């Protein structure tokens, strides 16, 4: 094969065993890589496992774009059965570990078992070692990466967990390069459960490519197109931070546990304020439009900001000072905690305190930076009753406290940075996301509003009317095919296309130059649909067939309450109309009214092997 190695590196920490597994060209062509390869592995190998048990498989998967000079092709997918949701879980990050894993000669690394004592894996091409990490256990991700570079040199890729992963916080993530994070549904906790502190990779091999000259030509064209885009200069200044002003103007900025869509101190935490604080930019490998805006926080330390962490740790907590928000963000990265879920967990505690449900004097109230910081640390170390409870995530916390009405999650995963009282398409995207409430798979809100953050120096406020047109379901699927499918399989960042308008035509051409396989758009959409159906089948199987359409509903708050302020004050989603939109989504996907893929759909997608497994737990149409 060209473009793929056709090899998966396997490590069994229980038995201290390392081996290489080969997989077929058919699997490579059908699942491409990244999320596709990870979903295929988990379907076959992680059946009815305890997410934090030794039988769960932790998958580090790359795609054909990785390790090569492709536009923003420095991503890696990390996947496992989620300890937070109980279903399929994954996330991606940009890291040199991706480049080195590919150059070491592997398309993926799969870790199983559990070490007796803390270890890290060191990979140098064909040589793989399992080494002691007892001296690293308990250290932050920043400290861990720095110490490992002192041992192995700077020319390596490193993935590590912090105290959050070690203490099995359900939304612990994997960190690389002091600020890049992956695995919102608890991939860091899975890593911690295996006593795996880090993975260090050094690769020196040349990746097999079908047409090097064509790849070079297309990549250069794409890089030039990005730099010459009208939106590039503003993007270079603010990156995703431009979305703070944009969401605030359009009543979508999470504010005080999503109780409102605009924040009175938004100007103090937006992209313009960030510009005045920025000391450097960070980007992923092979990226010429870096989005990591690094500022000095209130404690004089560097903190890498983007929209999501500022929205969830800022306005959502009622905190209006960017240097304080930056401290919370840095702590999350050092501790190895997902900034989004951490922000929603803390905001839930704040609202529960406000309502008198939580009476703990140490619990923070909205706007209380110091107590929010302390709670973040308590969560990472599972200190105290409140820290331990909040470490379980909002779903479990709300169930134990008997207060579900303001628990902002879907399938157990906390909602990311877009408030959807008046945006049914975005609510549908959250409801049907393959990992729970996350925006990366179908950031449909810009299409729904009719304007995007990077369209000028001033965020546009538009005349907007809530509609539930069937085309909204079709648009969600279209974006899921691209954002949650194509880009996650390649594995490449979607931002060149989303933010500065890089033509989608480059991607199949680049894929052909790398692999020699000519994919039509129908082929790519079918591959995306195949992976979505497989991920949904995984959820249904792991839930033993106990599945209903209610699993695809957004949080109740968006149905029952209205916005508290702004031009859409009092407005909210209507459940019957959302339900109709959900039915349209199922129809277009070829799923039944419960949200389970039909037999015929599975056959059309070459997923016949899924049918017998699903029929053991539920009846298929």
Swiss-Prot record:
Any GO MF annotation of the entry: metal ion binding
Gene3D superfamilies: Aldehyde Ferredoxin Oxidoreductase Protein, subunit A, domain 2, Aldehyde Ferredoxin Oxidoreductase Protein, subunit A, domain 3, Aldehyde ferredoxin oxidoreductase, N-terminal domain
Reactions the enzyme catalyzes: an aldehyde + 2 oxidized [2Fe-2S]-[ferredoxin] + H2O = a carboxylate + 2 reduced [2Fe-2S]-[ferredoxin] + 3 H(+)
Record: residues binding tungstopterin: 75, 92, 94, 180-181, 183-184, 333, 337-338, 488
Regulation: Inhibited by arsenite, iodoacetate and cyanide.
Family matches, as Pfam families: AFOR_C, AFOR_N
Key word Iron-sulfur present: yes
pH-dependence of activity, as noted: Optimum pH is above 10 (at 80 degrees Celsius).
Temperature dependence: Optimum temperature is above 90 degrees Celsius (at pH 8.4).
Record keywords: 4Fe-4S, Iron, Iron-sulfur, Metal-binding, Oxidoreductase, Tungsten
Top class in the EC scheme: oxidoreductase
Superkingdom of the source species: Archaea
Enzyme Commission number: 1.2.7.5
Binding site for [4Fe-4S] cluster: 284, 287, 291, 493
Cofactor(s) it depends on: [4Fe-4S] cluster; tungstopterin
Keyword Repeat: no
Cofactor binding mode and count: Binds 1 [4Fe-4S] cluster per subunit.
Subunit structure: Homotetramer.
Function: Catalyzes the oxidation of C1-C3 aldehydes. Can use formaldehyde, acetaldehyde, propionaldehyde but not glyoxylate, glucose or glyceraldehyde 3-phosphate. Uses ferredoxin as an electron acceptor for formaldehyde oxidation. Involved in peptides fermentation.
Annotated PANTHER family: ALDEHYDE FERREDOXIN OXIDOREDUCTASE (PTHR30038:SF5)
Family: Belongs to the AOR/FOR family.
Full protein name: Tungsten-containing formaldehyde ferredoxin oxidoreductase
Species per Swiss-Prot/TrEMBL record: Thermococcus litoralis (strain ATCC 51850 / DSM 5473 / JCM 8560 / NS-C)
């Amino acid at each position: 094969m060209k473009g793929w190695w056709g090899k998966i590196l396997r490590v069994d920490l229980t038995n201290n065993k390392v081996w290489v597994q080969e997989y077929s060209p058919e699997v490579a062509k059908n699942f491409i890589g990244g999320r596709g390869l990870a979903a295929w592995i988990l379907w076959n190998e992680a059946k009815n496992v305890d997410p934090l048990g030794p039988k769960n498989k932790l998958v580090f998967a790359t795609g054909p774009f990785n390790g090569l000079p492709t536009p923003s092709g420095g991503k890696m997918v990390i996947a496992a059965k989620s300890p937070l949701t109980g279903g399929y879980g994954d996330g991606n990050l940009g890291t040199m570990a991706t480049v080195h894993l590919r150059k070491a000669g592997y398309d993926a690394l799969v870790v199983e078992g559990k070490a007796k004592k803390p270890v890290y894996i060191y990979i140098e091409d064909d040589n793989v070692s399992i080494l002691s990490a007892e001296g690293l256990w308990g250290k932050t991700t920043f400290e861990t990466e720095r110490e490992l570079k002192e041992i192995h040199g700077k020319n390596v890729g490193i993935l590590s967990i912090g105290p959050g992963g070690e203490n099995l916080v359900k939304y612990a993530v994997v960190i690389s390069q002091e600020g890049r994070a992956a695995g919102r549904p608890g991939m860091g906790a899975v890593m911690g459960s295996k006593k795996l502190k880090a993975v260090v990779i050094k690769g020196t091999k040349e990746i097999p490519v079908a047409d090097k000259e064509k790849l070079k030509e297309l990549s250069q064209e794409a890089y030039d197109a990005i730099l010459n885009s009208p939106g590039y200069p503003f993007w270079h200044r603010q990156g995703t931070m431009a979305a703070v002003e944009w969401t605030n103007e359009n009543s979508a900025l999470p504010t005080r546990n999503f109780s409102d869509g605009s924040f009175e101190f938004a100007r103090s935490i937006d992209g313009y304020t960030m510009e005045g604080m920025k000391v450097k930019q960070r980007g992923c490998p092979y990226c010429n439009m870096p989005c990591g805006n690094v500022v000095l926080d209130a404690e004089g330390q560097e903190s890498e900001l983007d929209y999501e962490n500022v929205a969830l740790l800022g306005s959502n907590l009622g905190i209006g000072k960017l240097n304080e928000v930056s401290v919370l963000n840095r702590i999350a990265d050092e501790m190895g905690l997902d900034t989004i879920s951490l922000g929603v967990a803390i905001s839930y505690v704040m609202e529960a305190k406000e309502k008198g449900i939580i009476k703990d004097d140490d619990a923070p109230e909205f706007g209380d930076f110091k107590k929010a910081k302390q709670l973040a640390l308590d969560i990472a170390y599972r200190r105290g009753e409140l820290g331990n409870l909040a470490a379980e995530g909002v779903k479990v916390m709300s169930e134990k406290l008997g207060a579900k009405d303001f628990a902002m999650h879907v399938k157990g995963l906390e909602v990311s940075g877009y408030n959807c009282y008046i945006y049914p398409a975005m609510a549908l995207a959250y409801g049907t996301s393959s990992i729970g409430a996350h925006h990366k798979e179908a950031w449909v809100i810009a299409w729904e509003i009719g304007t995007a953050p990077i369209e000028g120096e001033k965020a546009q406020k538009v005349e907007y009317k809530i509609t539930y047109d069937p085309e909204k379901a079709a648009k969600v699927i279209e974006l899921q095919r691209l954002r949650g499918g194509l880009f996650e399989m390649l594995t490449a960042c979607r931002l060149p296309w989303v933010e500065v308008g890089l033509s989608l035509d480059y991607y199949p051409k680049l894929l052909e130059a790398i692999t020699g396989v000519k994919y039509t758009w129908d082929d790519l959409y079918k591959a995306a649909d195949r992976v979505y159906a497989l991920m949904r089948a995984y959820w249904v199987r792991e839930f033993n067939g106990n599945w209903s359409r209610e699993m695809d509903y957004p949080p109740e708050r968006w149905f029952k309450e209205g916005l508290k302020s702004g031009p859409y004050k009092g407005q909210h989603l209507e459940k019957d109309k959302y339900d109709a939109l959900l039915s349209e989504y199922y129809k277009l996907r070829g799923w039944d009214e419960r949200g389970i893929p039909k037999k015929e759909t599975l056959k059309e997608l070459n997923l016949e092997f899924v049918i017998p497994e699903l029929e053991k737990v539920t009846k298929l149409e």
